[in-house]
Amino acid sequence: MKMADGSTILRRNRPGTKSKDFCRWPDEPLEEMDSTLAVQQYIQQLIKRDPSNVELILTMPEAQDEGVWKYEHLRQFCMELNGLAVRLQKECSPSTCTQMTATDQWIFLCAAHKTPKECPAIDYTRHTLDGAACLLNSNKYFPSRVSIKESSVTKLGSVCRRVYRIFSHAYFHHRRIFDEFEAETYLCHRFTHFVTKYNLMSKENLIVPINVGENAAPGESEA
């Protein structure tokens, strides 16, 4: 992208850039982004502009491949969820949260093991985000950031279900941390709208009360 005087905009932070000036380059239309990472950059651009404008962030541009759009959003959610995981470490430990739970109705089993089993909540969080990163960066299932096979797109739903449990645990057991993080990022709000819009999760599993009032049924949930 070039400025009016013909000079090229360097879209990266130069050495010595102050934190308040990070990523403060002009917005660029998606169609002018010449990169295989264009969709990711476009989504991050919208988030940086106004994280509360969930509807705009989730509005898919014309002619955009829907599979790639969903994939890139889920990658972005997982990257941002690491920020919540870091904050949770302040009070969520194997001794304080021995199981991954939300309400008393559910105990979530961790899929990172050969046979899904119970994990302390903070370990479940780490395992889930690590597993999601491994899958979403897999050359076997997602060799391209430009087009994605439908058989690979179908794997996104299971990732959504697992990472959503991080939101639900934080909401029901670490409400102050959840509220502070959500006030800054609107991440759970955006995620809830995303999975609802693209039917990636059933509404009865969306137990954090963001435009969803249903509760989960009693039981034990496997990965």
UniProtKB/Swiss-Prot annotation:
| One Pfam family linked to the record | Mob1_phocein
The entry lists its GO molecular-function terms as: metal ion binding
Q: Record keywords: Cell division included?
A: no
Q: State any GO CC term.
A: FAR/SIN/STRIPAK complex
Q: Where is this region: Disordered?
A: 1-21
Q: Where does Zn(2+) bind?
A: 92, 97, 169, 174
List, alphabetically, the InterPro entries matched.
MOB_kinase_act_fam, MOB_kinase_act_sf
Query: GO annotations under biological process?
Result: axo-dendritic transport; cellular response to nutrient; microtubule cytoskeleton organization; negative regulation of hippo signaling; negative regulation of synaptic assembly at neuromuscular junction; neuron projection morphogenesis; positive regulation of insulin receptor signaling pathway; positive regulation of neuroblast proliferation
The alphabetical list of record keywords is: Metal-binding, Zinc
Which family is annotated?
Belongs to the MOB1/phocein family.
Q: What is this protein called?
A: MOB kinase activator-like 4
- Designated gene of the protein: Mob4
